[in-house]
Every structure is written in structure tokens, then in C-alpha cells.
Amino acid sequence: MVKGTSSKPGKVRKREVYDAPLHIRSKKIVAPLSAELQQKLGIKRIRVRKGDRVLIVRGSFKGHEGKVTSVDVKKGRIHVEGATLRKADGTEVPFPIHPSKVVVTELDLSDPRRKELVERKKQVVVSGQEG
């Protein structure tokens, strides 16, 4: 007997996320901005990138702040500077953290395209409130 795919809506939605290509999955790696940044930029959430400064708000590293050292698009996790585990042989490995469990406190705007994106989103929010 051939094993078929599920028709349960929850499982179908879950499969869509995990079977999605990487360019779509990378769009799902978003985190909320801190209250100060939200007020300053007029944006509530943004894609997390290497170089952003984040505050971990959930889990065993709660309260830890550091720079994002890498983003694992395939697994949907980020690695934060200083949030590491010590293996049995003494080596340190980065602890994978889900982006929804962090708050972005400082954006890395060294990329002109990202700066442009922030400005564009800001204009959309401002024009949406006026109209």
C-alpha cells in the first residue's frame, strides 16, 4: 500500500512551510523590533540578518544581548554571539534560536538596499495612517 499525503489542513500548512524553497523560507525569518526602533522607524518586524543586534526574550539565554553571527535559512534559526553550548570535548558551538524568540534592538544598515527597504516600509506605514 502506498503512503499518501495528508489532507488535514494543519498538516498541509505545515508541509508548505517545510517544503518551501530557500528564497521563500528566508522571508519567514523575521523578528519584532524593540519599542524604540518601532517608534523611530514605524516598522513592527523585519527580516533578521547577520550583524543585527538582538535581545533574546525567551529560553535559557533569556536576557542575553548580542550580534547575530549567522542565519540558518534551511533550519529557520539564528545564532547569536555569546549564546553557545559547550560540548563534552570542550569546544563551543552556537545555540540555534528561533527568530520569534528575539527582539531586534539595533539594525545593521550598512547595506544600501536594506536602508532603502526600511525607508520604503516607513513611507507605506506613514501614508497608510494619513489616508
From Swiss-Prot:
* Gene Ontology biological-process annotations: translation
Could you tell me which InterPro entries the record lists for this protein? KOW (IPR005824), Rib_uL2_dom2 (IPR014722), Ribosomal_uL24_CS (IPR005825), Ribosomal_uL24_euk/arc (IPR005756), Ribosomal_uL24_KOW (IPR041988), Translation_prot_SH3-like_sf (IPR008991)
Please indicate which superkingdom the organism of origin belongs to: Archaea
Keyword list (alphabetical) reads: Ribonucleoprotein, Ribosomal protein, RNA-binding, rRNA-binding
Database matches in PROSITE patterns: RIBOSOMAL_L24 (PS01108)
What Gene3D superfamilies does the annotation carry? Answer: 2.30.30.30
What GO MF annotations does this protein's record show? rRNA binding; structural constituent of ribosome
Q: Cellular component per GO? A: large ribosomal subunit
Q: Which HAMAP family match?
A: Ribosomal_uL24_A
Q: Do you know which NCBIfam families this protein is assigned to?
A: rplX_A_E
This chain's function reads: One of two assembly initiator proteins, it binds directly to the 5'-end of the 23S rRNA, where it nucleates assembly of the 50S subunit.
- Entry similarity comment: Belongs to the universal ribosomal protein uL24 family.
PANTHER family, A to Z: 60S RIBOSOMAL PROTEIN L26 FAMILY MEMBER
Q: How does it assemble?
A: Part of the 50S ribosomal subunit.
Q: What is this protein called?
A: Large ribosomal subunit protein uL24
- The scientific name of the source species is Thermofilum pendens (strain DSM 2475 / Hrk 5)
Gene name for this UniProt entry: rpl24
